[in-house]
């Protein structure tokens, strides 16, 4: 449980370093919500694009959001799934950098392909089960 929170704190810190606002200013638990309003704010599209590269998040409303409830400006994500695989703070920060790269380059297919390739490398290095294929 300590590693789950350590990974979440590393992720929140890395989002802020990358210029993405964490809604609560950080996290004290396994979850965080980031504000993507500076990057177009369409969390439905962002969720779909992240799904395509193997990173799973959820849309989330944020305080004072000007966007409609089905297309809010927030993305909610957490650290339990990556921590269960054995990822630590270093890899958690890398996952954030991949997310931010996709957010900032949403229309660039080449970058999205690079991100998908890197995600596959990470999950292969940190499998759920020894013989699990992704």
Regions found by a protein language model. Name each.
Residues 21-75, 79-86:
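Conserved PLP-binding catalytic core of the aspartate aminotransferase-like
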Residues 2, 48, 93:
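Short alpha-helical basic/polar micro-motif
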Residues 12-18, 22:
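Hard-cation-handling environments
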Residues 6-10, 69-134:
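PLP-dependent enzyme catalytic core of the Aspartate aminotransferase-like
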Residues 1-9, 28, 41-43, 109:
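Structural signature of PLP-dependent enzymes
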């Amino acid at each position: 449980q300590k590693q789950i929170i350590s990974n979440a704190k590393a992720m929140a810190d890395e989002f802020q370093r990358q210029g993405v606002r964490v809604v609560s200013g950080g996290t004290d638990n396994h979850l965080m919500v980031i504000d993507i309003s500076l990057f177009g704010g369409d969390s439905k599209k962002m969720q779909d694009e992240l799904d395509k590269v193997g990173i799973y998040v959820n849309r989330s409303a944020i305080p004072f959001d000007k966007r409609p409830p089905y297309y809010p400006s927030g993305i909610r994500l957490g650290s339990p799934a990556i921590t269960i695989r054995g990822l630590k703070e270093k890899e958690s920060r890398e996952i954030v950098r991949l997310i931010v790269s996709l957010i900032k380059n949403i229309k660039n297919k080449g970058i999205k392909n690079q991100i998908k390739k890197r995600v596959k490398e990470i999950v292969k290095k940190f499998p759920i089960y020894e013989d699990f294929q992704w």
